[in-house]
């Protein structure tokens, strides 16, 4: 019903399928061409429907971080389902699946953490900018937080312990940000 108030949708069923597909890809890079192809929709319609889901606060595009601000505009964003419970339900994940389907929970956990940090930032007086980092070697940081020129990284892991290789993305981000890098959380 809210969808009809926001935009004229000609294929309501496809909008639901899109939401389900985005839930399956939460926490991953958003390739609109692949999504369009998988749903049998043209790219323009897919872009329009994703924008509608964003306006309904169901999904969030997390832009890519690059030290060159112009390059941020052309890098691939990640897609996150805003409600991690909805993402888990659409992924057909149950509480007991935490261990047996652990690979499926990682992206949902990442989306949860990203959304919680963005929501909590609303309480701050200073504006924060949020993005993700991924280089050509596919080394990534799940969340990059900027306050002015200062940069922090957050890497989400679904594990009780970690090893030094888990911090590779944070080290790469620190190298890219240089003196602007203020710290990271793993």
Model-derived features: positions:
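Catalytic cores of nucleic-acid endonucleases
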Residues: 158-186
């Amino acid at each position: 019903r809210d969808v009809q108030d926001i935009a004229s949708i000609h294929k309501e069923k496809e909008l639901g399928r899109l939401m389900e597909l985005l839930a399956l890809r939460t926490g991953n890079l958003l390739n609109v061409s692949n999504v369009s192809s998988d749903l049998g929709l043209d790219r323009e319609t897919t872009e329009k429907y994703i924008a509608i889901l964003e306006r309904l606060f169901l999904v969030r595009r997390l832009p890519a971080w690059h030290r060159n601000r112009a390059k941020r505009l052309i890098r691939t964003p990640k897609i996150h389902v805003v409600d991690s419970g909805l993402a888990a339900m659409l992924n057909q994940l149950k509480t007991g699946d935490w261990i047996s389907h652990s690979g499926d929970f990682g992206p949902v956990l990442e989306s949860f953490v990203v959304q919680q940090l963005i929501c909590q930032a609303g309480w701050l007086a200073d504006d924060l900018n949020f993005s993700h980092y991924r280089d050509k070697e596919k080394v990534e940081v799940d969340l990059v937080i900027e306050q002015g020129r200062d940069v922090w990284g957050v890497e989400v892991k679904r594990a009780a312990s970690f090893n030094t290789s888990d911090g590779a993305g944070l080290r790469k981000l620190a190298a890219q940000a240089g003196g602007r890098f203020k710290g990271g959380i793993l």
